[in-house]
Amino acid sequence: MEIGGAQRLLSDLLPLQMKQADVTLLVFKSVNNALVDKLVEAGVKVISLEVKNVYNPLIIFKLKKYIKGYDVVHVHLFPALYWVAFASGSVEGKLIFTEHSTSNSRRGKRWLLPLERLVYGKYSEVVSISPQTRTALNLWLGRECSREVILNGINVEAFAGAASGVQSSDSIVMVSRFAPSKDQETVIRAMRYIDADVRLRFVGDGPLMAKNIELAESLGLLHRIDFIGAADDVARYIAEAKVGVQSSHWEGFGLTAVEIMACGRPVVASDVPGLKQVVQDAGLLFKAGDPEELARTVNSLLGDEQLYLQTARRCADRAAEYDIKKTAEGYWRVYNG
């Protein structure tokens, strides 16, 4: 299980669901990290198919024997969306999918639309993580496929506790995978307009990491930027920073933005659907892809203590609205509906 927003969500959600039912997590590939350890300690049974290529359709045949006998089979992310749909004849209970994003590469290919309609139609319920995610999916499919919205959540108390008493430095942090939906490039370019004493930390890995390291080097900024890679102790890295940034091309929700706010740090986020609704009127927004506006926004926080403290307080209050317990209650209602 890789370390991304959906994976971190499950690491908090499944232990709560274990209090109401037996839970098994089936993954395509096993990864040894703290998220998996946390699930195992909570009593969640973790099974890995150990496939070499997650896009191999032969996975369908492997899945059939594993998804029998459950009251609910709940699927997250692509390509599991497809493979479980095609293996759904083996499902004896409810089949549920959670849509996590307002956009993806498949939606740029109109010829895929009939297949997409077929796949989503296999699910008893399609849950979206935000109203914007639901709207985008239904527009793409041309029908009301997703009706239910269950907002993502985090363990707010854990993040607030991890940040308690931690002395932050003049630094910026962004916690995200280096993937097409994320926009670390704009944050790197913004560093040209931010005080030279301010450092930037990227927490996360992914296919576009090397490209971003090359960009930082070409701009002469590599000495001010730390590429941490994947990390388990996300809360610590957030707490050690003065400001958290979530720069995205598109976003279904913005779980990292909530984590930043729960740590009592101001968040500066791209003005894109999904993310905007989570942050607006609490943190600060900037025009997506605009490094100069991002820099001005960060500089305003670092240079104005009153603005900084007011924004941090609003962010902490907003984070309380996204407690993982509410997410668990929402899914339990869907499972039993």
Language-model features: where?
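Aromatic "clamp/platform" in nucleotide-sugar-dependent glycosyltransferases that forms part
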Residues: 230, 249
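Conserved acidic donor-binding segment of nucleotide-sugar-dependent glycosyltransferases
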Residues: 269, 284-291, 300-305
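Short His-centered aromatic/hydrophobic patch
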Residues: 75-82, 99
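N-terminal strand-loop element at the rim of the active site
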Residues: 1-57, 208
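Short hydrophobic beta-strand element within catalytic cores of glycosyltransferases
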Residues: 26, 266-269
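A short, well-ordered alpha-helix in the C-terminal region of glycosyltransferases
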Residues: 293, 300, 307-321, 330-333
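A conserved mid-protein helix/loop that constitutes part of the nucleotide-sugar donor-binding site
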Residues: 4-15, 170, 174-193, 207-214, ...
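Acidic anion/phosphate-binding donor-loop and adjacent secondary structure
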Residues: 54, 58, 135-139, 144, ...
